[in-house]
Amino acid sequence: MESKKRLDLISLTSIPLVMTLGNSMLIPVLPSIQKKLEISSFQVSMIITVYSIVAILLIPIAGYLSDRIGRKKVIIPSLIITGIGGLVTGWAAWKINDPYWIILLGRLLQGIGSAGAAPVVLPLVGDMFKNEKEVSSGLGLIETSNTFGKVISPIVGAVLASVIWHLPFWFIPLFCFISIVLVFFLVKVPKADDKKPPLFHDFVKSFKKTFKYNNRWLIAIFSIGGIIMFVLFGILFYLSTTLEEMFGITGIQKGLVLAIPLLALSIASYIAGKKIGQNKAVMKWLTFSGSLLLSISLLSAIFTDEIYFLLGILFISGIGIGTTLPCLDALITEGIEKEARGTITSLYSSMRFVGVALGPPIYAIIMKSDHNMVFYISAAASFIASTFAFFAIKPEKEKGENIKEENLMKKSPYRLSDY
């Protein structure tokens, strides 16, 4: 990796870290918020879900704008909006007697900001490096930052909430400010090509053409990303409630317990990002193996009520998720031409947010009937993801030189180099 771009990349890692902290550090605090506001488990799950729903709708627009006007011009205003959303939620929780709906409004603003920040990082990393191995390594670092945020977020959230329950809301604008400074001063955007970005009509036409020729692997990757995040956030929501209700684990101790499977996720993500290089066959099989490992480990959880055995199972599940995510990032980023990279990767990010949005409320409903059903559904969803990876992602073996780009361009303005 070019040494002069290390600072750029390190600065970019602050964005997924901030966005993850802004969402995931609330998970261990949700039971406390539920008690303070006197709301149902479904209502408290909406604090996570409303953030994700608005992001789902706006991420593709942010991706298109980043292709048109530039990545940095989308990222910085988005971070500012996220910070404002954090101020709204903090102020509502502090000053208003019945703050639930204003908190949701603040979370809505955070979702708007997140739509234009974290998802645009992926195509920007793709723009910064010409060598696919460096792109994979950079994406692995971004995904590791994302997962590292998930590891520390329950601990940070629990520590802050132990002081006062709404303190986590106030730290979101602080984190955003730090990220804005880093991105503004340290990230150097690659010089734009001379050719003009496509008009919206041409963009829609080429977008349709892309899915005509690449629908199988694109839909597979979108689906796997959504399923993985659905299971991850659903299980985290389940754990946050169960640790408190069934095992009496609360506060900072609960944050530490929640961090255990997320630590496995972070380590696996870092190693996978470093090892996959530009070998798309390896990416396919790691995606398949990680999803299958997740399915098997979660299914085995129905056979125990012991907390230590359960955490061991979830540690293995974290390895499965951490192995899968960097491969999905690399497949979709390296397989798309620069001009459309922002839009397509943003659609992928939208699908991941669909999983984040659906996980907590659906698991909140399932938990009322049968706790084992949580693991049955999680295992089944993960198995479906593994079948998508097995049957729909089919990298061809390279024979001599790579297929020439101009031949691929006859089919589509987007590519998956070895497909």
Residue ranges and their predicted role:
Residues 1-2, 188-220, 410-414, 419:
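Juxtamembrane intracellular "pre-TM" segments in multi-pass secondary transporters
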Residues 100, 104-148:
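Cytoplasmic helix-loop-helix junction between adjacent transmembrane helices
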